Amino acid sequence: DITLVEPAAITEDKSAINAADPLIKDAVTGSTGVGSVAAPLVYNGMVIVGITGVGYGLHLEDALKKNGQLSAVIGFAGKYGQPGFMAAFDASNGAEKWRFETTKKGWEGDFVEKTAYGVPLRRDVTKEKANAPQFGDAWRFGGGSIWHSPAVDSERGLIYFGTGNPSPQSMGAGRPGDNLYTVSLVALEAATGKLVWHFQQVPHDMWGYDVASSPTLFDVTIDGKTIPAVGQASKVGWYFVNDR
């Protein structure tokens, strides 16, 4: 068997916020809540698969609880999540060959004010930059689940997949920056896991616009020129076509 995730040091336990709820008595297990929902890709002697469940936890500090009760949820910065990742394992023995984490140190990016296709993000970039030093480790809890199997271009030796929302999902104050490589279409070298390129559909996502559907590979003709393309149906309601 291939073990994808080791239990986190800090996880759900008897001190969890809702552990005393009679409706879920004895349901607190200590599980991280992380798993894989997509079929793995078997390619060139490797099993390639991503993890999910890293972008939706209720990430609250114990200090935010008052008298054992939680008075509010919206507006709190997050912790106790983890980066999502795509990983390759040796198909013969399960040994991990490479891992690409979807959030990394430096995930703040360029603090862009528009998407790559020109839609204003209406971000307070000045405030985000001022807060960045305070949240320098936010990428360690950054989310970026992978909800589908990757597409493979055997001619180029590349795989393509989309990533989920950053964590915490709808609260961006604790994660300044573009939150690379969440909500992105990502291309990796299949043999090494090295990043070749990415296209971030929504930087600093606040709305849960996961790149959740599987990419499709095809050729497209533009002005008489045939271009190898990768297409992806997005949650923003557009179908994106990128040059592979």
Question: What annotation goes with each model-predicted range?
Answer:
Residues 1-244:
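Noncatalytic, solvent-exposed loop/strand surfaces
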